Amino acid sequence: VASHVPVILSSSSVFPEPTAATFEMAATVGYDGVEVMVWTDAVSQDAGALQGLAKHYGVPVLSVHAPCLLVTQRVWSPDPWERLGRAAQLAEALGAPTVVVHPPFTWQRDYARNFAQGLAKVQARHPDTTFAIENMYPVRMAGRTFVPYVPGWDPTEAGYDAYTLDLSHCAAARTDSLEMADRMGSGLKHVHLGDGTGEGRDEHLVPGRGNQPCAELLRSLSSRGFRGSVALEVSTRKVTSREKRVQDLRESLEFARRHLAPAGSAAPAVTSDVRRG
């Protein structure tokens, strides 16, 4: 009996390869779908192009990551509300049920001041979409620590209807992902699977290569009543070939399927085909 939880591939996991390569590698390895990180790659912003890729490779888009990164502050618009609205429209066009959202940066004063109310308005305009706020982490530089998010890096302190649990961010924050999941409670709607060592930076390691309780967290999802997707969000930018990138993505998928599988059942097989690039 296979787990009902889809395991999907974030387009950030194939960087620096483009968004289109995500669909190819997801199909090659056997992921259940894709999470599109909206950023400067034009394809990531284009519903028609993404629909074409999903159809060609037979891999649906199951979540959209709104352009919340430092490098995406001018994707679509410098206005963060416009960016979030466009991300919601993109998700609807693709049939993706979830939009991942970061808490506001400290310098986004107006956005931060009205974030809860504005989010409620966006939710009202897109009632079938889940806007899942992601846990972040404090930044440590030159022996100093600061939090670039308002009201903080832990969204459960403010309280939202839906959350994305990022395990690599838990490691960077030196917190336990099981405890974070407990704080999120029934609001846990989406997972970013990765790992980290707790060195104070965001590493996005292949699950099992750090010290987060990745296996335990995945095994706990069934008892938590989780009905969302698990998106692999790892860094493969330093690998030396497409083959090695695919190997990391395959290892990660096998890890996820193994620990999501109900007790006493076998995890679904992972595709062995490797396309060299």
PLM ranges: what are they?
Residues 2-8, 15-27, 55, 86-97, ...:
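Histidine-acidic metal/acid-base catalytic patches
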Residues 9-13, 36-40, 63-68, 101-105, ...:
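A cross-domain feature marking catalytic cores of carbohydrate-active enzymes
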Residues 32, 36-113, 226-227, 235-239:
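Structural motif corresponding to the early beta-alpha repeats
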Residues 70-74, 102-110, 135-143, 169, ...:
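Surface-exposed cleft-lining segments at the edges of enzyme active sites
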Residues 106, 115-138:
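Catalytic cores of phosphodiester-bond-cleaving enzymes
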